[in-house]
Amino acid sequence: MGDKTWLPFPVVLLAALLLPRAAGFTPSLDSDFTFTLPAGQKECFYQPMPLKASLEIEYQVLDGAGLDIDFHLASPEGKTLVFEQRKSDGVHTIETEVGDYMFCFDNTFSTISEKVIFFELILDNMGEQEQEQEDWKKYITGTDMLDMKLEDILESINSIKSRLSKSGHIQTLLRAFEARDRNIQESNFDRVNFWSMVNLVVMVVVSAIQVYMLKSLFEDKRKSRT
């Protein structure tokens, strides 16, 4: 589910020459989904997780009456970690264990309105990343200057990778906010048009009644005898 992280060519070449057996960087899991949950239904998802990883789950209700949903997050053992009712959005970060985590979106409380839901998963496996950094170091033991250079390169790569991941995360959230705001505006636009038409019809009917009543006041209802 994760995307591959590509390194600049000079860094890849340097690593190939100096560290022939070193492991590559492990990309973080960063996935987002948007789906429609019908009224009266519940949808659950399962995600396998490694040990001691950092999992962040963020969700938003983009469209639907009330913009609310019930959210449930459970551990591989079935223990409830998070349970929220009638929420429009939420962010949760947990340290994971080995196993499949379950998270559910529940719309059974609604009998009419379906909900459009966006959620994003971000997994940062810091344990494996630190181990890979140690694997890099053991191939350059005894070369202090080279060790310093490679550590600087590694630190720069991790910093750029973290910032790019954060930028992508923010852009995804901004798109979700924009979609929800657009849905709200379109809903308000439809309501304004509907009630404007109702007011127009009422005004026309009232005007017709007033004209009829005024006209009836000036009519001579007396019948002339022949």
UniProtKB/Swiss-Prot annotation:
Annotated PROSITE patterns: GOLD (PS50866)
Q: Which GO biological-process labels does this protein carry?
A: endoplasmic reticulum to Golgi vesicle-mediated transport; Golgi ribbon formation; intracellular protein transport
InterPro entries per the record? Emp24-like, GOLD_dom, GOLD_dom_sf
What is one GO cellular-component annotation here? endoplasmic reticulum-Golgi intermediate compartment membrane
What is known about its subunit structure? Interacts with TMED9 and TMED10.
The entry sums up its family as follows: Belongs to the EMP24/GP25L family.
Q: How does it sit in the membrane?
A: Single-pass type I membrane protein
Q: Which residues form the GOLD domain?
A: 42-123
Q: Which residues lie on this side of the membrane: Lumenal?
A: 25-193
- Any idea what this protein is called? Transmembrane emp24 domain-containing protein 5
Q: Where is this motif: Mediates export from ER?
A: 217-218
Q: Which terms are listed as keywords in the entry?
A: Endoplasmic reticulum, Golgi apparatus, Membrane, Protein transport, Signal, Transmembrane, Transmembrane helix, Transport
List residues traversing the bilayer: 194-214
